[in-house]
Amino acid sequence: MAKVQAYVSDEIVYKINKIVERRRAEGAKSTDVSFSSISTMLLELGLRVYEAQMERKESAFNQAEFNKVLLECAVKTQSTVAKILGIESLSPHVSGNPKFEYANMVEDIRDKVSSEMERFFPENDEE
């Protein structure tokens, strides 16, 4: 095993010592948990994160292109569904039922979408 010497800030030393203390308080033996073992673990984790980020940069995935395709599909779906709702509202099977009038269906959909969006993206009164 190679020996590595690195200089870190006092804050980092403090945080590593807190991890060591917490592990020992949880019942780990002093031979199992040390400043060195925790530092090695954190260094390995940091290296994995760094390598994962580098792989992402080299990836052929293009977020902007993905967003464009996703938006295009959503708009096509919205347009298609609007046409289907229009056709359905003219059906003689639902004629006279206000629940299936086009304007009422659109309003109902908007209300349901609005409540779902509010659930995930609550409006802030402060803005």
UniProtKB/Swiss-Prot annotation:
Keywords: Conjugation, Cytoplasm, DNA-binding, Plasmid, Transcription, Transcription regulation
Listed InterPro entries: IHF-like_DNA-bd_dom_sf, TraM_DNA-bd, TRelaxosome_TraM
Regions crossing the membrane: none
Keyword Ribosomal protein among UniProt keywords: no
Signal peptide: none
CC terms in the record's Gene Ontology section: cytoplasm
Chief place where the protein resides: cytoplasm
GO molecular function: DNA binding
The protein's role, per its UniProt record: Conjugative DNA transfer (CDT) is the unidirectional transfer of ssDNA plasmid from a donor to a recipient cell. It is the central mechanism by which antibiotic resistance and virulence factors are propagated in bacterial populations. Part of the relaxosome, which facilitates a site- and strand-specific cut in the origin of transfer by TraI, at the nic site. Probably autoregulates its own expression. Plasmid specificity is conferred by the TraD-TraM pair.
Protein name, UniProt field: Relaxosome protein TraM
